[in-house]
Amino acid sequence: MIAFTLLLSFLVALVAAKPTTCTKGAHVIVARGSLEPQGPGAMGELAEKVLKLVPGSDIESLVYPALYNEYLESQPVGVRTLTSVIQAYVKNCPKTQLVLMGYSQGAHVIMDTICGASSTGFPATLPQPSFVTDKISSVILLGDPSLTEGQTFHVGTSVGSGMFPRNLPAGCDSIAKKTVSVCDKGDPFCEAGGKDLSVHLGYIPVWGDYVVKESVRLAKAFIKKAKAC
């Protein structure tokens, strides 16, 4: 616990020290999966493709522990950090769109931040206000443990819910039309009872082109709408 507290203090200092630079394209925030080193992780490959296809964009890697054994402590830290990051960015850069991309625990962090945390075992939080969600052009998720059966933005072959389904899935309604949450059958995290870890680790080559295309489509639609206003 002492080591975790020291790590948390270090991460908070890193976040606080980072200046804000507004972009004309999209500000892409990437939340890595469990046990990946600090940075964008596997999702970074897809984020870089979005940057190339949406001119004037930049990328930010969410600074949070991404621990596995301490998941119940690590994930809420990510939620608190991402909440601070996106609210500060929207206030400082109100004309810039946000693209959120998360893998595994990172996907869970993003959805709890935006939808409000309502899964059993995690501290409850409220959904983000409209001044934040209105600036989000797309949310791209791979292997989200909080995926809940019936959510319209699910794509893939999985059945049922993830390990940590939402008790209040309606909190995601504000971003449902701009979210893509990929989960395939056998993934032990986004499909509770799944037993094939290779499915969870294999989304980039299978779904990468699709989610990049969707993110870019939504980003360009956001820019077009902003210019029309």
Cite the ranges covered by each PLM segment.
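Fungal secretory targeting signals
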Residues: 1-20, 228-229
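Structural motif
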Residues: 27, 137-140, 178-180
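Generic anion/oxyanion-binding catalytic loop in active/binding sites
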Residues: 6, 71, 128
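Serine-dependent carboxylesterase/thioesterase catalytic core
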Residues: 82-173
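Active-site catalytic motif of lipid deacylating hydrolases and related acyltransferases
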Residues: 20-97, 182-212, 219
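Short, well-ordered coil/turn elements that cap or connect secondary structure elements
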Residues: 12, 23, 54, 95, ...
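C-terminal catalytic-base region of ester-bond hydrolases, centering on the histidine
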Residues: 151-229
